[in-house]
């Protein structure tokens, strides 16, 4: 890792048609951030200059960099490792799915992974990309700019592919609630089929290690059930969750469950568990976003959109926002 008291954080700009560039400018407008790290945005400098105008911050200057070493890392200046992705920013459609936007977002992710693997940045943080736009681009260019890849389910799978990682999972966190997933971006039918003993054990082990890496000693790993009431003690359901839990216990992990999904998250919020292993995407996303996303009924707008996405199991650090591209909000 790079030896410095302030780590270098590579931040992707996200889909240029979304609100990622604007969110980035707003985030980097906080002076205290520069006291803790050295951020550098990976993207098209012209898009970030446009974002500065959108958010009304003429006091912020965009500094184009050819290498990470060119960064000034000074408050009031946003360093951008420039990639020429959108030739004509003025004619680029904001708030729409496009091949150009999808390709731009993908190239930023690919580049930041390369930088992390080369130890040029200490950690990575990704803004949202639009999966439809990205996959349109991958298919349109027939893998020419993606090392032959013509489809990715999302960020997690891109990181796994470009770091040659086989065992990984997504963790969402909001204060004391942490959730990890057996599967993510697949249909519910397929998600049920993926609940296998080997995969459940794998994710329990990843979750246990992640908690220990975060400084939690002897973490309590809750494992959610799949069927209502966890199958009523065997009356129905044939998933292999319980055997995986027993195997994890035999390996010294404090795994607990299976626990009914309608109560495990409240218990985790109350401090009973340090992390919850969820059987599929929405089982983990819904409770976390229920506590992290707050909608103001009177103002008819989001009051808070909080949560951090972390990919576990990678050889590099990857964090992300826990929301989408916000096409409807871009440029406003």
What do these predicted ranges mean?
Residues 156:
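Active-site-proximal region of nucleotide-activated glycan assembly enzymes
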């Amino acid at each position: 890792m790079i030896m410095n008291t302030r780590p270098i954080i590579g931040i992707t700009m996200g889909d240029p048609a979304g609100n990622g560039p604007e969110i980035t400018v707003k985030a980097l407008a906080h002076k205290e951030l520069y006291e803790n790290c050295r951020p550098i945005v990976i993207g098209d400098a012209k898009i970030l200059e446009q974002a500065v105008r959108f958010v009304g911050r003429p006091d912020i200057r965009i500094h184009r960099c050819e290498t990470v070493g060119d960064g000034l890392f000074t408050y009031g200046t946003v360093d951008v490792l420039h990639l020429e992705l959108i030739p004509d920013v003025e004619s680029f459609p904001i708030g729409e799915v496009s091949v150009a936007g999808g390709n731009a977002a993908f190239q930023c992710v690919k580049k930041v992974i390369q930088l992390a693997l080369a130890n040029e940045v200490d950690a990575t943080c990704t803004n949202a990309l639009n999966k439809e736009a990205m996959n349109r681009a991958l298919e349109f260019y027939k893998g020419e700019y993606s090392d032959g890849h013509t489809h990715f389910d999302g960020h997690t799978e891109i990181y796994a592919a470009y770091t040659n990682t086989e065992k990984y999972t997504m963790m969402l966190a909001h204060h004391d609630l942490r959730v990890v997933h057996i599967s993510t971006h697949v249909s519910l039918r397929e998600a049920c089929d993926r609940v296998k003993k080997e995969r459940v054990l794998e994710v329990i082990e990843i979750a246990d290690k992640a908690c220990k890496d975060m400084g939690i000693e002897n973490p309590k790993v809750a494992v959610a059930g799949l069927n209502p009431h966890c199958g009523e003690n065997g009356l129905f359901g044939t998933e292999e969750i319980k055997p995986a839990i027993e195997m994890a216990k035999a390996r010294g992990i404090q795994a607990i469950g299976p626990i009914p999904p309608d109560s495990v998250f409240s218990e985790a919020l109350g401090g009973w568990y340090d992390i919850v292993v969820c059987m599929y995407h929405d089982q983990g996303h819904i409770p976390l976003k229920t506590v992290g996303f707050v909608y103001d009924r009177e103002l008819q707008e989001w009051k808070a959109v909080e949560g951090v996405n972390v990919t576990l199991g990678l050889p590099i650090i990857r964090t992300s926002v826990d929301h989408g591209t916000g096409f409807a909000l871009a440029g406003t």
